[in-house]
């Protein structure tokens, strides 16, 4: 870490290697794949200049039997590498390819992409202009998916109904994209265990109601919806917010909400409405909770 290494030498002979941290170097080349006999537990190659990952004769970069963290954030990769498999019996804790130059997936066009089996997949800060439906088509098993800051304009219809593992999804970060709507299959029927969804800094004119179908939805953020010129887009209050039984935190600041006639649910104990210049609402039913410190109002 924090050196001037430009080439990672062949380490395939180090069969018992478990942790490797080469972050903050100047690595452009990985000389040779570790191979599937090297089962890394933690690999950090963040903040380098890596453009591609080598493979062994079996198409493997390394072994994945005990992976906790596998990170290539802040590099120069152009494609999400086809080195994992959604059918693997081993579940990786986290896979991080954030802040590269990724605009697609290896094997997506010819149908050879094998998917991913990981609790968390982070690919924010890349160049994915279209939603990565390939993860769902290949039945990738993921609980938390980070797609922030990609400029994604659309999520194709049928994305979440196409996978038999959509029900595993719990957390979605879709902030800083260009979405204006969510497909009908983005709902609690396909993702019944959704915990948190953040669609802040997009282009919605109304609060998407699909995620509210999930009985477990606890955190929902729809902050700062703007058009390409920076104009505020969201003015309408979601009428069915009271139908979300588990919602405890609702963040809708930075919009242009007007008069709200709906009764604010006392179950929402963190309510953020700051930077809505024209907002008007009645909070009398939660005043006692605010005084008691049991309700956090951010305005």
Give the label of every model feature segment.
Residues 3, 22-25, 48, 72-75, ...:
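Consensus "Asn ladder" position of solenoid repeat domains
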Residues 11-13, 33-36, 57-62, 84-86, ...:
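Hydrophobic anchor residues at the C-terminal helix/turn of individual leucine-rich repeat
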Residues 8-11, 30, 53-56, 80, ...:
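Canonical leucine-rich repeat
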Residues 55-59, 104-108, 221-231:
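Acidic/polar low-complexity surface segments
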Residues 36-39, 62-68, 86-93, 114-119, ...:
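Surface-exposed loop/turn motifs in large extracellular/passenger domains
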Residues 195, 200, 216-232, 243-251, ...:
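C-terminal capping region of solenoid repeat domains
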Residues 18-22, 41-45, 68-72, 92-97, ...:
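Conserved hydrophobic beta-strand positions in leucine-rich repeat
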Residues 5, 17, 27, 40, ...:
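Conserved hydrophobic position(s) of the canonical leucine-rich repeat
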